């Protein structure tokens, strides 16, 4: 008598295609599937995987951070690749000459990059220019930077917790007494 094997946990949970029905995104997936198969390079595998990702996992990257990473990398000829959005940062006064490839670049960021003598590429242009990912700098934004992530972690109020509490309102009466002032219990 055979053993009845439980196949309950057999499914591997990972995206094999993007959820979006955007035809342009799906064309890029088709292109990078081909490149990943034919070149067998890690760069193309990472790009393909990131094209599948949800918007939460493709956080935006500001020009300020791009400029900082670019300077630290010390590779003036490299192309910066971001599978996501590149946004402008008004606090950055001087934009260096950059070659940026991204899914989306905001209008002001694009203007500033072009004004500095740089260029903005699409992923199909990058595939022609650098099919193996040679001379590129692959960057991504901070996934934990969004406001929702500030609520995750140790419970608010416990020692050494910097977690933001879920509060109905930010008024005088809400989470402003015990632990916040010495007249009510203690001051943290």
Swiss-Prot record:
The primary site where this protein sits is cytoplasm
GO BP annotation list: cytoplasmic translation
Where in the cell does this protein reside? Cytoplasm
GO molecular function terms listed in the Swiss-Prot or TrEMBL record: RNA binding; structural constituent of ribosome
Please, which domain of life does this record's source organism belong to?
Answer: Eukaryota
Asked if the Swiss-Prot or TrEMBL record annotates the protein with the keyword Ribonucleoprotein, the reply is: yes
Looking up Pfam families in the UniProt record yields: Ribosomal_L18
Gene Ontology cellular-component annotations: cytosolic large ribosomal subunit; cytosolic ribosome
Q: Which UniProt keywords apply?
A: Cytoplasm, Ribonucleoprotein, Ribosomal protein
Keyword rRNA-binding listed? The answer is no
Task: Read off the InterPro entries from this record.
Answer: Ribosomal_eL18, Ribosomal_eL18/eL18-A/B/_CS, Ribosomal_uL15/eL18, Ribosomal_uL15/eL18_sf
In which family does this protein belong, per the annotation? Answer: Belongs to the eukaryotic ribosomal protein eL18 family.
This chain belongs to the protein called: Large ribosomal subunit protein eL18
Query: From which organism does this entry originate?
Result: Drosophila melanogaster
């Amino acid at each position: 008598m055979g053993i009845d094997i439980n196949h309950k946990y057999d499914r591997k949970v990972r995206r094999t295609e993007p959820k979006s029905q955007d035809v342009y995104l799906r064309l890029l997936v088709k292109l990078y599937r081909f490149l990943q198969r034919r070149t067998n390079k890690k760069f193309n595998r990472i790009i393909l995987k990131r094209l599948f990702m949800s918007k939460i996992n493709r956080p935006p990257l500001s020009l300020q951070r791009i400029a900082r990473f670019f300077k630290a990398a010390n590779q003036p000829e490299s192309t910066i690749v971001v599978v996501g959005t590149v946004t402008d940062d008004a606090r950055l006064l001087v934009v260096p000459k950059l070659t940026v490839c991204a899914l989306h670049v905001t209008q002001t960021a694009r203007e500033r990059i072009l004004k500095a003598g740089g260029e903005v590429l699409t992923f199909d242009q990058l595939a022609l220019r650098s099919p193996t990912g040679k001379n590129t700098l692959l960057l991504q934004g901070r996934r934990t930077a969004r406001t929702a992530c500030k609520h995750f972690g140790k419970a608010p109020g416990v020692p050494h917790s910097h977690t933001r509490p879920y509060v109905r309102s930010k008024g005088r009466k809400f989470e402003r007494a015990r632990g916040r002032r010495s007249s009510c219990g203690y001051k943290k």
